[in-house]
Amino acid sequence: NTTLAFVKNYENGDREFSFYRHPGADMMLSSDEVEYEQIKQSRLFHFGTLSMTDDNVKEATKRAIETAKNNGLIISFDPNLRPPLWKSLDDARNQIAYGLSQCDVLKISDNEIEFMTGTSDFDKGANILMERYPNIKLLNITAGADGSYSYYREIRAYVPSYLLGGTIDTTGAGDTFCGSVLNLSLIHISEPTR
């Protein structure tokens, strides 16, 4: 089966996710099905924790990350916390911490940074993560209607959100943001800034 995600949109812009997944094809990927040669020929490897909720796919993800790191790829991570997919939030926190320890580029949402740092202050949260995980070179926070923040070395950038009138659903906006950041990274960075 293909995992199905259902999104309920509230009038205030918040969303609630529910899933039809057990089992889903995304949970069943094993290490021997990963295209390691394709990873080795790439410049960037992006992953999230949705592929770390179950043992087989978690092992496949970790081996893919190891292959990417061993071949000098830029490693990008988006926690993409979806509580209904986890056995426990402690397990989610542990796997997110693993992802944070592996990445060069991080895209994290406002609720995820609070989940991992205990603060809703983005500057404090970014400092906590970058001190705890010095491997993170570029940290991006998406905050929905409150815009986005980027941190690189001593530089902090803020961009207000851009909403068109009549916007109904922003699902996927964070993924689009992340894809755009990664595209620009590949254009302007010839090698990871490790």
Where are these regions (language model features)?
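Glycine-rich beta-alpha junction loops
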Residues: 1, 23, 81-83, 112, ...
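Conserved phosphate-binding/catalytic region of the ribokinase-like
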Residues: 66, 119-190, 194
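Conserved N-terminal subdomain of the carbohydrate kinase-like
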Residues: 1-49
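Acidic, amphipathic alpha-helical patches
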Residues: 35, 96, 167
